Amino acid sequence: MTVQKLVATAVLVALVSLILNNAAAFTPNWVYQTLEDGRKRSVGLWKSCWLVDRGKGGTSPGTRTGQVDTHDCEVLGWGSESAGFQESRGTVKLQFDMMRACNLVATAALAVGQITFILGLTGLPLMSPESQCWEEAMAAAFQLASFVLVIGLVTFYRIGPYTNLSWSCYLNIGACLLATLAAAMLIWNILHRREDCMAPRVIVISRSLTARFRRGLDNDYVESPC
């Protein structure tokens, strides 16, 4: 079974997006916060950790200043207000809850796209590589992932003076761009195929038609393969 290189490349790009999206979700480095007393911590979607230079438990042996102390972390969940500290707790809670929801939806959508690709390779009637529905289903899944990630990331366009975006956030931006690229590649391939099939039929008229009408005259014509 031959799979088009463009489709395979788009699925590979979406797989990288899925990996980056999960890496951004489960690392406590979404934002860095600095308190008035000088303490610093890194906050992720599901966990927050104090930095070892001024953490509550002091510097751990063998660690460098500015590193995350994995022994002094707090699990965060839906509606956690501790992510705010000196910032507006309600605003920060809404930002992180929105991002958690969008991250989960994007993960599910990207996973569905990968499963759809695998099912197509098995030769199912509705999901075969020759079926246009196969590419459309993957494109819709990847586009949904891109859309919800944009919604979640937009909520962080405004942050407080004590908060700075960290590398996990930028990692998720990369995942969003890759999901968009994967969807765009599939959509371009679908539209390109449709343009080929929507071309007008090519009809070759026999020269004998210019002669007088005779019974039994056959018309020669050639139609496009689509």
From Swiss-Prot:
The keyword ATP-binding is assigned to this record: no
UniProtKB keywords: Cell junction, Cell membrane, Glycoprotein, Membrane, Transmembrane, Transmembrane helix
Cytoplasmic side: 1-5, 125-136, 192-226
InterPro entries, per the entry: TMEM204
Coiled-coil annotated spans: none
Protein location: Cell junction, Adherens junction; Cell membrane
Chief location: other
Record's bilayer topology term: Multi-pass membrane protein
Cellular-component GO terms for this entry: adherens junction; plasma membrane
Transmembrane segments: 6-26, 104-124, 137-157, 171-191
Residue intervals annotated with topology Extracellular: 27-103, 158-170
Residues of this chain annotated as glycosylated in UniProt: N164
GO biological process: lymph vessel development; regulation of vascular endothelial growth factor receptor signaling pathway; smooth muscle cell differentiation
Record's function text: Can influence paracellular permeability. Appears to be involved in cell-cell interactions through adherens.
Protein known as: Transmembrane protein 204
